[in-house]
Amino acid sequence: MTGEQEWVQPSGVWATAVGVARVRALESEREDALFRDPLAQAFAAAGGLWPSSPPLPDDEAARRRRLAVAFSIVVRTKFLDDLLEHATASGVRQVVLLGAGMDSRAFRMAWPEGTRLFEVDTPAPLEFKASVLRQERAVAHCERITVAVDLREDWPSALAAAGHDAAIPTAWIGEGLLIYLPEDAVELLLARIGEQSASGSRMGLTLGSRGVIERFAAGAVPGSAASMWVSEMPDDPVGWLAGHGWEASCHTLRERAVAYGRPMSTLPQHEDGPGGLISAVRR
């Protein structure tokens, strides 16, 4: 990165993607990192969050909530990395990242030959991201296709126009996305995904856990990620997704953290983090 580069500063919901990049950059510096994201620091720096960031709040409860959110980002990233590896091992060669933000999986993961990865997001984050990628001379490890469209619009048509083939299996990722959408928008999104999913498609989602808005968003600073959360997971996420044509499994952040050798020992049970993790197969 050079000091001469002028970046369009992130704003609104997509600005939270830069905060996610900062968390991934910090994780990547650990000796026991659950993943390595060599581009995360560049994204965070371009967004003004590296090397400095907003200080932790003085309030102990708020501090724990901030740490819980960061922890959840690390765990969900590893979870979805594994899901994509399993999907491609099963023969899936199309990947769609919905609300892609600063996701760098096209660049940091190994992909089988012939994999096409579509990044769907609004123009502003995609343009910001493209500037950083050019600066870093980043080279994707698969065919990477960006689709500039708002998910509130007719994104399936835009995705099809970009080359997505609904007749063959797709791995769909909705990471840190649904929690920002009202329930009717979540239902529409799931219906549209289903319409574009051949049998054998995979899906990975993160959902806001029950009570997350009360626990995390109620006292959130305006403009912060938590201040924009509006939806939580249904009481029966597996049954809910079955109604959309998916055979799903639901995992807690604490459960996955233990499996990854990173137990959440410093957090009380009621402060596990803001969400649950879903893996699903289209039948």
UniProtKB/Swiss-Prot annotation:
InterPro entries, sorted: Ppm1/Ppm2/Tcmp, SAM-dependent_MTases_sf, SAM_mthyl_Trfase_ML2640-like
GO BP term, pick one: methylation
Gene3D superfamilies: Vaccinia Virus protein VP39 (3.40.50.150)
Listed Pfam families: LCM
Keywords on record: Methyltransferase, S-adenosyl-L-methionine, Transferase
EC number from the UniProt entry: 2.1.1.-
Region feature (Disordered): 264-283
SUPFAM superfamilies with a match to the protein in the record: S-adenosyl-L-methionine-dependent methyltransferases (SSF53335)
Summary of the function given for this chain in its UniProt record: Exhibits S-adenosyl-L-methionine-dependent methyltransferase activity.
NCBIfam families cross-referenced by the UniProt entry: mthyl_TIGR00027
Family that this chain belongs to: Belongs to the UPF0677 family.
Name of the protein in its database record: Putative S-adenosyl-L-methionine-dependent methyltransferase SCO7813
